[in-house]
Every structure is written in structure tokens, then in C-alpha cells.
């Protein structure tokens, strides 16, 4: 059993001056090519990897999921495909800082915008040549107090597992391959008849084993709980989000892979004078991963190499 702990902490303190008025550019007045994501759709998806839930949520955004298993690296983002021999990945900016999007929860997010054209490079430099996924987290609103709690538990059924030959068909085709190579068949007629009438896993002489069925479950489980607090007045506004997420893998035999993660975020805005304001954003994440019997997709790779008549 291998445990891996991650502790992620970021903090930011910024002071800005305002000259009594602000300008809010509407989407239809902007010259940038922007797609916006519906945050409520992301919250409804039973996937603990936030990056995976962005697939199909914005025009022109391509999401390539990581196939390593629960708790692995973020999905890869491409805007308008891969168009050069170099890196084509879009970058993720969260509240002005480049960070992995899976570091946060959907409940922390106010908006997600995908910048697709040259305006992204103007704003964020050469690293944004391939597009920017711009994430803004929630902030408190004066006179509007919010207390929200949510809890989820569910199962994620396997879409499809590979189907392999049973022992009888495997032995029959193996004999044909031997004959085609000018060799004698490996399995006798008695063996073939034994495999045809095999009682399955417990047949000592002629086993017929579906290793995917024996080693893997038909579904994994996930669990999630979040608490949101926000509010404030004309002088100070706050927004706090605390969340727990967890997931268990498909392993039926041996140690089961497991992920437990706690996220916490606090955003504070203070109006010091009519011309001076300060904001502080703090985010933390503590994560425990148990890789189980095999790391990532290693179990799938090994099961696929086992013959159905190899072990009783």
C-alpha cells in the first residue's frame, strides 16, 4: 500500500486604487473571442476531476482526460485543436495566477471563460498563445448573506470492459495457429472438450477464468460534501468555501485505490476609504491518495495479458 500526501497552499494580498468609477465591458462589446461555461452544469456532473467535466462545455475547447485513475494529473486542454509541432496546450489562470484547475471545486467558481484569440496573448503573454481558460472564484456581496450546504454519494458504473475469448475458443484458435506454423496442436481433443464443459474458475484441470470479472468491480463510488458562506456590508465582504471529496476505485482483489481530499478557500475584500481597497485570497488543499494494489492502469495492463486457462 502506498500513501501519497499533498499539501497545497497559496495566498495573495493585493491593494488597488479606484478613482470613483469602474467600467464593465459587456460580452457583446468585447473584441475577444470568448466562450463561457455554465457552472451549474459542472456541479451536476458525477466526476471529482473538475478538468474532466469541461468536455463539451465550451465551443472550441478540447479536453483530453488523463487515464491514470482517480487523483491523477489534470486533463489536457486544447483550444481549436493542435496546430503546431510545439506545445499546443491552453493555460489555466485562476484569480490571476496560473494553477491547475483540479486544485479547486466547482462550488468555489463564479465564472469560467475560454479566451481563444490574440487578445489572450496580449493579456497574458507568449504562454497564452494557445488560449487561456480564465477562472474567477466567488466573492462576497454586500447585504447578501449566503449559507449553503450540499452532500452527494453515488456510484459510477463502468462504461465497458474489454471482452476476451473463453478458454475453449482460445485453445481452439491457438491450435489453429500452431498448425499454420507447421507445429503440432498444443491442446488435445480431450482438453478442448474439457474447456467446453469447464465449470469456470474452480475447475482445476480445465479452468475458464474471466479475469476482469474476478479482479474488478462493475462500478466505483464517489462522495462529496461542501459548505459555502458569504456575505458582507459596504466596508467588508467575504466568501468562504470548504469541501470534502472522495472516491474509491474498481479493485475487487487486494488493496482498493482511494482518494480523500479537503479544499478550503477564503476571499476577503475590504474598502478602506473611497479611494483605497484591499483584497486577500487564501486557498489550501490537503489530499491523501492510496494507489491500491497497482499504480494507475497497471492492473488493467496485467489482466489483459492473462490467458483464460492460465490459472484455476
Predicted regions mapped to residue ranges:
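Short, small/polar-rich motifs associated with maturation and membrane association
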Residues: 1-265, 272, 277-279
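Short linear motifs in intrinsically disordered
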Residues: 78-85, 303-304, 309-311
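Outer-membrane beta-barrel and related beta-rich outer-membrane complex signature
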Residues: 158-167, 252-254, 279-281, 286-310
Amino acid at each position: 500500500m502506498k500513501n501519497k500526501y499533498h499539501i497545497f497552499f497559496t495566498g495573495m494580498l493585493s491593494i488597488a486604487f479606484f478613482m470613483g468609477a469602474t467600467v464593465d465591458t459587456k460580452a457583446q462589446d468585447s473584441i475577444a473571442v470568448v466562450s463561457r461555461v455554465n457552472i451549474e452544469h459542472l456541479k451536476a456532473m458525477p466526476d471529482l476531476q473538475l478538468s474532466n467535466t469541461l468536455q463539451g462545455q465550451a465551443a472550441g475547447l478540447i479536453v483530453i482526460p488523463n487515464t491514470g485513475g482517480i487523483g491523477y494529473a489534470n486533463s489536457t486542454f486544447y483550444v481549436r485543436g493542435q496546430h503546431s509541432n510545439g506545445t499546443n496546450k491552453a493555460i489555466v489562470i485562476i484569480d490571476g495566477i496560473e494553477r491547475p484547475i483540479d486544485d479547486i471545486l466547482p462550488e468555489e467558481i463564479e465564472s469560467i471563460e475560454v479566451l481563444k484569440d490574440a487578445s489572450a496573448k496580449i493579456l497574458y503573454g507568449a504562454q497564452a498563445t494557445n488560449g487561456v481558460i480564465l477562472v474567477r472564484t466567488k466573492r462576497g456581496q454586500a447585504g447578501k448573506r449566503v449559507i449553503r450546504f450540499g452532500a452527494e454519494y453515488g456510484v459510477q458504473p463502468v462504461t465497458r470492459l474489454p471482452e476476451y475469448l473463453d478458454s475453449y475458443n482460445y485453445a481452439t484458435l491457438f491450435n489453429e495457429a500452431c498448425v499454420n506454423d507447421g507445429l503440432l496442436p498444443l491442446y488435445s481433443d480431450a482438453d478442448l472438450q474439457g474447456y467446453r464443459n469447464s465449470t469456470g474458475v474452480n475447475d482445476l484441470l480445465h479452468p475458464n477464468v474471466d479475469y476482469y470479472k474476478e479482479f474488478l468491480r462493475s462500478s466505483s463510488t464517489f462522495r462529496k460534501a461542501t459548505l459555502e458562506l458569504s456575505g458582507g456590508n459596504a466596508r467588508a465582504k467575504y466568501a468562504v468555501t470548504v469541501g470534502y471529496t472522495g472516491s474509491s476505485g474498481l479493485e475487487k482483489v487486494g488493496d482498493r485505490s482511494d482518494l480523500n481530499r479537503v479544499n478550503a478557500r477564503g476571499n476577503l475584500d475590504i474598502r478602506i476609504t473611497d479611494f483605497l481597497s484591499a483584497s486577500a485570497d487564501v486557498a489550501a488543499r490537503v489530499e491523501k491518495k492510496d494507489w491500491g494494489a497497482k499504480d494507475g492502469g497497471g492492473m488493467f495492463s496485467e489482466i489483459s495479458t492473462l490467458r483464460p486457462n492460465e490459472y484455476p
